[in-house]
Amino acid sequence: MTNNYKFSAILPIYRGVNFHTFKKPFESIINQTLKPNELLIIFDGPIKNNIRKLIEEYQGKYNFIKIINFPSNRGLGYVLNRAVKLCKNKYIARCDADDISIPDRFKIQINYLNKNHKIDVLGSNIIELYDNKFFSKKKMTLIHENIINQLNFRNPMNHS
């Protein structure tokens, strides 16, 4: 029940990103069961050639991939704010260069947003890996009042 909602995904990358830890997270975005109609990949300063080549290879296959290039490193906050302003869609999925998304992440989240129009921000629980092995599971509260109560002490979102 995705209702043909269009959405954007943003993926910031900086020079410190390792190719081997980047490839699987990047492909987990590309191979989603519900693909974004716009994937903004933001190069925050110069990036490694092998990462650039991989992205350009996929860009040749998928017309929804757009590259935004900042010549010098501006920092994650700046890059995310710029990316949000450049997105063409109401819904925006934030992705990290080291986070692997389950194949139907976008489908689940877009369906949830379609059914719950009062929702402004949506996150999820996460499983943390260390050396490709289970490290911990981070569960967040789903109760609105608990989220509000946590705001002064911690970020109630795993991915923000």
Residue ranges and their predicted role:
Residues M1-S160:
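Nucleotide-sugar donor-binding/catalytic module of glycosyltransferases
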